[in-house]
Amino acid sequence: MEMNEAYPAMTGTLRLENIGIVLVEPQIPENIGAAARAMYNMGIRSLSLVRPKNCELERVLKTATGPSMDLIEEMEVFDRLLPAIGPYGYVVGTTARIGALRPAQTSPRRLARDLVPITRHNRVAILFGPEDRGLSNDHLRYCHTIANIPTAGFSSLNLAQAVMLFCYEVFMASREPGGKAEPRLANKFELEGMYDHLRDVLERIGFLDPQNPEHWMTNIRRFLSRVPLRAREVRVIRGVCRQMDWYAGQLEKQKARHREDAGKGPD
């Protein structure tokens, strides 16, 4: 469909150049092309793929017509999710399936409004899962928030349709005046380094079950994700971890000396 009148350039404070779309394990090349076209229509230029099952260029370009072909030429392809989202300070997961382990926390429209202050100083990734099953719980654990598209009944949408809905809401929010900008948030590389450090220390002091450390770590992730952490706050938490690690090491040395002394016996 041709548009008779294009919208004027962005006048709000949501920075579209800081929005990235990440398609995780997409299966149908035509959906990749259609998603790129939807993104281009709404002013979003960053597209990444993670382990695409089929990325046959000829089929992709059938639906990525016109200028959106540039997005296909510039898109990045990754073997794992973390390298794809590592540079982003805020990550959004999308899902049609909601439940106790994946509570829907926002809608596309509310999300777009919430992103206005965040995008001033942070890059934001919006993740979409494979067509047949969506994002897994392992994918969603990297996300700051989970968004769900409300529907009247049948909740399954075509991948490109879902991308268009989110991109449209983000574009419309970019035309509205925004509030106070969020400072720079910790990116996913920094956050995952913190979580790894925290898990190692909590295992060392006996807080986590070494046979199943991820059980409590999932709860800790949820707790710490309620408010996006700034880079400075991540450094503080890692400083606490280092101090706990040092103290645990001192206790271990002290216990070792006591065992050594006890083994010597009386003179």
Where in the sequence are the language-model features?
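Post-transcriptional modification and biogenesis factors for structured RNAs
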Residues: 1-267
